A protein has these predicted regions:
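The feature captures the beta-strand-to-loop junction immediately N-terminal to the Walker
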Residues: 41-43
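Helix-to-loop junction immediately C-terminal to a conserved catalytic motif
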Residues: 56
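A short, proline-enriched helix->beta-strand linker immediately N-terminal to the Walker B motif
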Residues: 147-151
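Catalytic Walker B motif of ABC-type/P-loop ATPase nucleotide-binding domains
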Residues: 153-156
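Hydrophobic anchor residue at the start of the ABC signature
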Residues: 142
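Conserved ABC ATPase signature
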Residues: 128-132, 136
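Short helical segment in ABC ATPase nucleotide-binding domains corresponding to the A-loop/adjacent helical element
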Residues: 91-99, 109, 217
Length: 248
């Protein structure tokens, strides 16, 4: 790896409500290396998405700090829903982020269309979202994010709205795209299989308030696709270890 791109140092977060103070995150410490794919798993509602909001700077931690040791890091965010606008064509949807930032040029448009063609959507530029499959829509959402050339991708359960077969296929494709484009990724999910099949490391969070219970390095070749990983003995072993940790 090439050094830490992101560090969370003793990060805690409290919410103040009429009922009192609620602790959401407790003393989180971990880093993400440049070029690494890290997954965070934990029970639903444990604070995984809350952690992403701190990384993006939408909220500030109550204590501790989120740092970027190599300087400011351009980030992209991929959500559970694709949020494509139904009245815009695929090409115009993917250019939306560039439009909002007033960065649409012949060069940026050409680069974006090249990404669509490279990853199998070149024949659908004039199609509308309603004419696309769920997997195609979510892949378009990823390319919309990549069009802004982020260095760090934050993936917030990006496959959870899809059927199981599409999820498996799309995870393979998204993994390949992220590797091919040389991006760093932080995935949050409650799906253990998804985490083990895609990541270099898995961070296991406790129930709320989220603490880091365990960090597991996955001893599989970094470029092995997710579907191929699922057939290995190492996949079964890591899955069982994480499941055991979550049940404690």
């Amino acid at each position: 790896m090439n050094g830490a791109l992101l560090c969370l140092e003793n990060v805690s977060l409290y919410y103040h409500t009429p009922q009192g103070e609620t602790e959401a995150l407790r003393d989180l410490c971990f880093s993400v290396e440049k070029g690494e794919f890290v997954a965070v798993v934990g029970p639903s509602g444990c604070g995984k998405t809350t952690m992403l909001s701190l990384i993006m700077g939408l909220n500030a931690p109550s204590s501790g700090q989120v740092t970027f040791p190599q300087g400011p890091v351009p980030m992209g965010y991929m959500l559970q829903r694709d949020n494509l606008l139904e009245w815009r064509t695929l090409e115009k949807n993917v250019l939306l982020g560039l439009e909002v930032q007033h960065k649409v040029t012949e060069e940026s448009r050409g680069r974006t269309v090249a990404l669509l063609k490279k990853y199998g959507l070149g024949d659908f530029l004039s199609h509308y979202p309603g004419q696309l499959s769920g997997g195609m829509r979510q892949k378009a959402a990823l390319i919309r994010t990549l069009a802004l050339d982020p260095e760090l991708l934050l993936l917030d359960e990006p496959f959870s709205a899809l059927d199981y077969q599409t999820r498996l296929t799309l995870a393979d494709e998204v993994f390949s795209i992220i590797r091919a484009e040389g991006k760093t990724a932080l995935l949050v999910t409650h799906d253990i299989g998804e985490a083990v099949s895609m990541a270099d490391r898995v961070l296991v969070f406790s129930d709320r308030p989220a603490t880091l219970k365990r960090e597991i390095s996955l001893d599989v070749p970094g470029n092995m696709p997710p579907l191929a990983r699922r057939e290995t003995n190492a996949f079964q072993e890591h899955f069982a270890a994480i499941w055991k940790e979550l049940k404690r």
